[in-house]
From Swiss-Prot:
Function text: Plays an important role in the de novo pathway of purine nucleotide biosynthesis. Catalyzes the first committed step in the biosynthesis of AMP from IMP.
The protein's annotated pathway: Purine metabolism; AMP biosynthesis via de novo pathway; AMP from IMP: step 1/2
Protein name: Adenylosuccinate synthetase
Organism of this sequence: Leifsonia xyli subsp. xyli (strain CTCB07)
Keywords: Cytoplasm, GTP-binding, Ligase, Magnesium, Metal-binding, Nucleotide-binding, Purine biosynthesis
Amino acid sequence: MPAIVIIGAQWGDEGKGKATDLLGSRIDYVVKFNGGNNAGHTVVVGDEKYALHLLPSGILTGGVTPVIANGVVVDLDVLFQELDGLIARGVDVSRLKISSNAHVITHYHRTIDKVTERFLGKRQIGTTGRGIGPTYADKINRVGIRIQDLFDENILRQKVEGALDQKNHLLVKVYNRRAIGLDEIVDDLLSYAERLRPMVVDSSLLLHQALEDGKYVLFEGGQATMLDVDHGTYPFVTSSSSTSGGAATGSGIGPNRIDRVIGIVKAYTTRVGSGPFPTELFDEWGEFLRERGFEFGTTTGRPRRTGWYDAPIARYTARVNGVTDFVLTKLDTLTGIERIPVCVAYDVDGVRHDEVPASQSDFHHAKPIYEEFPGWTEDISGARRFEDLPKNAQDYTHALERMSGARISAIGVGPARDEIVVRHDLVGEAPSPADASR
């Protein structure tokens, strides 16, 4: 059976949790393969709203096995806060599995993250300060702490001691902060071990066996393509691989097992933190999108930057990920706008660019070239078929589909889990290349 990857196709906060939830009743496993608790998603179930930061959204669907795979960095305090919060609300969390190879965020990672960002001043990246980047840096530098290390105190103590030799030198000599004690870190990590033990598995083997047994496996990407460490707007990116390729390396399955890649795009664009954003709005329309779309970070609560839909970005992310289907979210946010601008290309120093410039400098100087489309005033939250949408909303969707590099297979028309229009089956046979790129 297929492995399906869901990817954010802009700068994050596109509504991936809702798309995952849409597929949940037909999915057996939901896998988080990158990132940590630096990106949140909100899932609405009936009258209940759940804000998740680390746990896969599949944990809210009965019968689904949620998996935190090896590509994730895990803050154990956040993990158990989220689990305990769900347990208190009657959610069964006993199915959760965590890779023994996932890396652990410690107190010193969070400290380094925060003081480094302050030290950078105007050059700061805009991190969430949750220790994600420093944990991935330790992973690459081969001094990281993995989940499996918590079950051997001698190994854990040796690894933490080696890491603190460097971290404390940096904190004391460069940042003028106090040193962090070895026992403080080791005791904290060991306190989680026994509760964690029943959840820990070889996630690569688990997922391989699931696919061999004909199970449906959904890979849920954190952050988004334009924040990918290789393919995003570097250096204003996250520290992990947030494209479809990261699903294979971040979980231990072969790339040939991936059958479909579903890209999630808002009907407009948002971004959090620093970095280029060609369609960003600084006027009343930017505030309109922010207030109407509730564009405030699930993790940080900070206001998101807002702008119009960017078709070159969608084409770029379709190409980088091999997107077979797009899910267009928050179309309802645009209701009431008389003329809706869409960025169709960029002007860079008087030269038209139909695609995202490869040069970082060019992209920083890119000015959007807009085409406008007529809007609609009707409430679309009750639409369940494409034909139920106002003609102008249908035309807007068709226009985005033509410009974006893959078919739009579902459309979000409201915040609730059932407020969605499904045009094409997202679990059945994948579209042909001609259909996917039309």
